[in-house]
Amino acid sequence: MWSYAVHGAVWLVLYLLFILAPLFVLLAGTLPPARDFWTEFAVALGYSGLAMMGLQFGLTARFRFVTRPWGEDVIYHFHRQISLIAVGLVFAHPLIIFAAQPELLARPEDGSVPLGALAAVASIGALALLVVTALWRVRLKIGYELWHASHIVLALVAVGGGIVHMVGWSFYLEDPRKRALWIGLVALWIALLLYVRVVKPLFMLRRPYRIAEVRAERGDTTTLVMRPDGHAGFRFSPGQFGWLTLWGSPFKITGHPFSFSPSAEAAGGRVEMSIRNLGDFTSAIHQVPVGQRVYLDGS
């Protein structure tokens, strides 16, 4: 228990360092001309919000050594809550700047709009759609697959737009150390995205499972019994959940999260998932044929 607490504390400190690093670096090196307090405060909120948004790729990468101290359900709850905080910071950024410098709302005489401004509008618009669809997906009757795909696209637009906006204005990027920090952060975010969408599916492709049994349960629930195909499987903790890719390759954008239902000590690497029919994807679970190849991400 003590080792888990230390492990968790270390990751929490590292997370805070990544979030606060842009603010610390703002004070280092060559400083641009000073501006009023509210403008600088708004810029600090924008930098922090962008850093938090980028690190969401890490929270959703499902690294076992990161999720182990808390559990994946806690990590995803944290992802949801911290995302709302990041969105609040990003939304506050332009509101405070325009309140402090209303002249910025005036359009240039030649009618052109700077690329940084267009990128900011795209980023904030994507964030607004992302929040609305995440909080009210069920009420809006958006299917899980469509929501998950759009969630990824909107997140990429939001973060990408924020980066272009930052580079477009580049007020604090003249100093080499500041540029180096943001180049490093962006490279980290891209690496995390590639890990989730390329590297991890490659590992899953080499470690498939086969449906060994499809068992009907009470309450319109079906249990899928799966056994590793050509490998020893993986160990999981009681209550842990994994992502099931049932029809398609592990490179498919959407995996469906379900809890593992058997004991973590099940023989032969066997895993089971008891899935209740809630419509959409789950309505066809009982039709899965024995012997079908599936992919599990439980790491």
Give the location of each predicted region.
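Membrane-embedded alpha-helical bundles of multi-pass integral membrane proteins
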Residues: 2-194
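Short, structured interface segments
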Residues: 186-198, 292-298
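Hydrophobic alpha-helical transmembrane segments in integral membrane proteins
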Residues: 170, 174, 193-210
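Intrinsically disordered, low-complexity segments enriched in polar/charged residues with Gly/Pro
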Residues: 37-39, 44, 60-62, 132-134, ...
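Ferredoxin-reductase
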Residues: 203-297
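Detector for methionine-enriched segments
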Residues: 1, 52-53, 166, 204, ...
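A generic short-segment signal for beta-strand/edge and adjacent turn/coil regions
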Residues: 20-22, 35-36, 56, 125-127, ...
